Amino acid sequence: MAREYKIEDYRNFGIMAHIDAGKTTTTERILYYTGKSHKIGEVHDGAATMDWMEQEQERGITITSAATTTFWKGRDGKMRRFNIIDTPGHVDFTIEVERSLRVLDGAIALLDANAGVEPQTETVWRQAEKYNVPRMIFCNKMDKTGADFYRSVEMIKTRLGATAVVMQLPIGAESDFKGVVDLVEMNALIWRDESLGAQWDVVEIPDDLKAKAEEYREKLIETVVEIDEAAMEAYLEGNMPDNDKIRELVRRGTIDVKFHPMFCGTAFKNKGVQPLLDAVVDYLPSPLDIPAIKGIDFKTEADIERHADDAEPLSMLAFKIMNDPFVGSLTFARIYSGKLEKGSSVLNTVKDKRERVGRMLQMHSNSREDIEEAFAGDIVALAGLKETTTGDTLCDPLKPVILERMEFPEPVIQIAIEPKSKGDQEKMGLALNRLAAEDPSFRVKTDQESGQTIIAGMGELHLDIIVDRMRREFKVEANVGAPQVAYRETITRQTEEDYTHKKQTGGTGQFARVKIIFEPNPEGEDFKFESKIVGGAVPKEYIPGVQKGIESVLSSGPLAGFPMLGVKATLIDGAFHDVDSSVLAFEIASRACFREAAKKAGAQLLEPMMKVEVVTPEDYVGDVIGDLNSRRGQIQGQESRGIAVVISANVPLANMFKYVDNLRSMSQGRAQYTMTFDHYAPVPSNVATEIQAKYSGQK
């Protein structure tokens, strides 16, 4: 079967935003207008197509990013293929956003016109910056009370440090919002309410907006000509670019991430969605417009690139594992190069295992269609893969490559969990392992001392939903303990330790001597190992044993047994024995060496500090600040946002449990907050003593 759509007609994009900015509703409208849905699903009815897990429909939030393929006819009459990924906006599910952005070519950032740039908008924006994803902005909810398009434009500059190129102006606001002014064509689009937004009239720009439209068109042209010398010169000589040239320059600037075209509308009231779809075609990149994916040659470790071309060897990235009630485990993958046929064998280069593609599916939210083959640029779901996990590379076994890996955040909260009936122990283990395979930010471990099962994740809601899914999907009822903070330990000063491991038990003995400098790692929280051995005091083949020995102890620090961060170790001297030395002997020596050194190196307890933003009516500001201070919070600042006040603070996670209930009663339900992990910080000594006393007995 040949390729149906040329690769230049593909648009792989995601929709990203703060929770409640209207992402799922916008996606529903896109599916409706592109003909994939016959009835519009509303989130508040629990009927949205993209939100297919039961918990999503109950809570009205999106948890997993559903991938959907649909089609749209551009302004030129040509059909385009859209692969859309709907991502969650709740901070506990940031991992979903991160891995979606990794495999997308472009994104639409949604803003709530009333709130503008919110904390989670900043978080997902930063993630998109990290992967250099071209973005457009859609200022949604223009029909909402307090909607202010121009303030949102300003906030993009002040809060995100980004340049928005305004492409449309709103006609009216709040309940009077009727349509938009198109600043390229210089006309107005007014939607007909009775047609569910499917039809609109193109009319002249209203008189009261003509001057503003001229002003903003001028700004638009000024910004876009800056990226092209010839266009800039022509403009300075008084020659204005024509409309096609403006679109071409906007496209170039968007793909190069120089600026972000901005549109407005209200997805819920069905206004402004079709011009947004035209803009996806006009301004977001096809797989051919973005740089080739980088990787390393599996055999030679040389840097290589794979281009978006069916003729190149197959390479794809598994970016999500999902448990499907009908098909079993599904692996979502983005094909970067080559083509994939059903039944073919691929190599997982991260695990060095071959996998056979049993079935290949194209997903529409939670319905599916079997396909025989897929091509460069496609996003597909594969059934039958046994070894593959999120972030793995799958490729042609004859031309193996390892694509750039994804990075996943460390969990900040953990709870003990046990099945309500002893007979469910095995079932619970199976369920948790399945869920951990789907979500790399969720971890499961067994506490060595107590034998308890511990689950760890990105927040209370994250773990609530895991427990909930276990009950619904795997029929396992569980008891959960109180949430516990994922503390860490570090060292604060340099120390040098000389340790000799000697054991003689008849026959071959064990001997290893190491001299190591331990100090805080100036480069960050990771462990860094260096060898400065000269003259063969420790043979080269034993040095990996020294590193492995230290790493094995980092999982349990000297104060209360928490994992250690930010340690640097430098091996400077040692000794070996021709017969009795081995890698294992050096592993044992370095392990004991670090245990001794850690006691002398000023071990310190660290706790996760959270960036908290509270949006509250002015009446409650004093109470909110007083309460945050009582939680050991450090107030970072406050600003007005409309009639509300936004308070920013850094607060230890340990003091934020059940904060939502406190805030609700303090503000009579009128204040809201968001919380994201910010950094690890030293625990004050009086609090550290309590924590050590509590945990030392458990470890």
From Swiss-Prot:
Which GO terms of type biological process are on file?
Answer: ribosome disassembly
Please list the residue ranges annotated as the tr-type G domain: 8-288
**Which compartments does it reside in?**
Cytoplasm
Entry's CDD domains? Answer: EF-G, EFG_III, EFG_mtEFG1_IV, EFG_mtEFG_C, EFG_mtEFG_II
May I have one GO cellular component term?
cytoplasm
Entry-linked SUPFAM superfamilies: EF-G C-terminal domain-like (SSF54980), P-loop containing nucleoside triphosphate hydrolases (SSF52540), Ribosomal protein S5 domain 2-like (SSF54211), Translation proteins (SSF50447)
Gene Ontology terms for molecular function: GTP binding; GTPase activity; translation elongation factor activity
Q: Keywords in UniProt for this one?
A: Cytoplasm, Elongation factor, GTP-binding, Nucleotide-binding, Protein biosynthesis
Could you tell me which InterPro entries the record lists for this protein? EF-G-like_DII (IPR053905), EFG_II (IPR041095), EFG_III (IPR009022), EFG_III/V (IPR035647), EFG_IV (IPR047872), EFG_V (IPR035649), EFG_V-like (IPR000640), G_TR_CS (IPR031157)
Mention any Pfam family matching this sequence. Answer: EFG_C
Which residues are noted in the entry as GTP-binding?
17-24, 86-90, 140-143
Q: Which domain of life is it from?
A: Bacteria
> What is its biological role?
Catalyzes the GTP-dependent ribosomal translocation step during translation elongation. During this step, the ribosome changes from the pre-translocational (PRE) to the post-translocational (POST) state as the newly formed A-site-bound peptidyl-tRNA and P-site-bound deacylated tRNA move to the P and E sites, respectively. Catalyzes the coordinated movement of the two tRNA molecules, the mRNA and conformational changes in the ribosome.
Q: Which family does it belong to?
A: Belongs to the TRAFAC class translation factor GTPase superfamily. Classic translation factor GTPase family. EF-G/EF-2 subfamily.
Protein name as catalogued: Elongation factor G
Q: Which organism is it from?
A: Rhizobium etli (strain ATCC 51251 / DSM 11541 / JCM 21823 / NBRC 15573 / CFN 42)
Record lineage: Bacteria, Pseudomonadati, Pseudomonadota, Alphaproteobacteria, Hyphomicrobiales
Name the gene that codes for it.
fusA
